[in-house]
A protein has these predicted regions:
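Nucleotide-sugar donor-binding/catalytic module of glycosyltransferases
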Residues: 1-128
Length: 130
């Protein structure tokens, strides 16, 4: 298998409490040939600042700051910058297993697939007065 570039697009909007964990998981992927396109959609919290800190540490990260226009236009903005053979969308409140991208690329390459859909886990965290 060759080593195709994967463009990981992350829309960012007011996620200061979750975006660092998301970016840590992306930067720790076992598939190293990635570009990470962070598109800040006019966040009013510290999300953009957190993204800047990650961009300073990892040259694979591209950071775009734009006015708020919604998640669909934000993803499209990321797509317009993507250079990879494959595109992976990750929401900024999600985090990935270390081999997530590698498994997607392996499946796509092995099956000459145009689309790979990944399973996901939902973990609900709450406190109860009961």
């Amino acid at each position: 298998m060759n080593n195709p570039l994967v463009s990981i697009i992350v829309p960012v909007y007011n996620v200061q409490n979750s975006v660092a964990r998301c970016l840590e998981s992306i930067c720790a992927q076992t598939w190293k040939n990635i570009e990470v396109i962070l598109v800040n959609d006019g966040s009013r919290d510290e999300s953009f600042s957190i993204c800047e800190q990650f961009r300073e540490k990892d040259p694979r990260i591209v950071l775009v700051d734009k006015s708020n226009s919604g998640v669909s236009e934000t993803r499209n903005c990321g797509m317009s910058l993507a250079r990879g053979k494959y595109v992976q969308f990750v929401d900024s409140d999600d985090y990935l297993d270390p081999d997530f991208t590698e498994r997607l690329v392996t499946a796509a390459e092995a099956n000459n697939a145009d689309l790979v859909i990944a399973p996901y886990w939902i973990c609900l965290l709450y406190t109860s007065d009961a």
